[in-house]
Amino acid sequence: KPKTLTLEGLGGLTIGQPVPANSSFTAGDGQIGNGCETLSSPEWPGVYAIRTNGEVRRISVADGSGVKLVEGIGPGSTIEDVRAEFPSFREEPHKYTGPGGKYLTQPGDEPRLRFEINPDGKVSIIHVGVMPELGYVEGCA
């Protein structure tokens, strides 16, 4: 399977669409019950998705997923790589990691990319999706 994250989606999941009937992505236990669910799949380690009101709204890829963007950037890439490839992205301080951690977010309203950067300057998670879910800091919150 190609492990390439696009603005459209990944692994049969499409931003703005329901999860396909044959998908291995399912909602696990311990959901908050606010109409938002976190989905994962045994076939896609290190990947999770957010579904709100029946639609996939965000897909996130972390270390161990083996997933990259077409540009070759993935978890473990450097903030310099991200800035060079995506110079227009907005930078904000990370909510949890302390100094040096950042979010780099693609401007606009359509499905967009958002990078979480650790204080060591490496990409920890790449998200694709739409606001407000794209900006959620922990799962459905």
What do the PLM-derived regions correspond to, one by one?
Residues 6-12, 66-73:
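Second-shell loop/turn segments in exported
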Residues 128-141:
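Short, low-complexity, Pro/Ser/Thr/Gly-rich segments in the mature regions of secreted, periplasmic
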Residues 12-13, 68, 88, 134:
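Ligand-recognition elements built from short beta-strands and adjacent flexible loops
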Residues 1-20:
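N-terminal low-complexity, Pro/Thr/Ser-rich intrinsically disordered segments
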Residues 125:
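A motif-centric signal for short, conserved binding hotspots located
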Residues 54-55, 59-62, 71-75:
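Mid-length scaffold segments of soluble, non-membrane domains
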Residues 67-85:
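Mature extracytoplasmic domains of secretory-pathway proteins
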Residues 18-52, 79-122:
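A cross-family detector of function-defining hotspots
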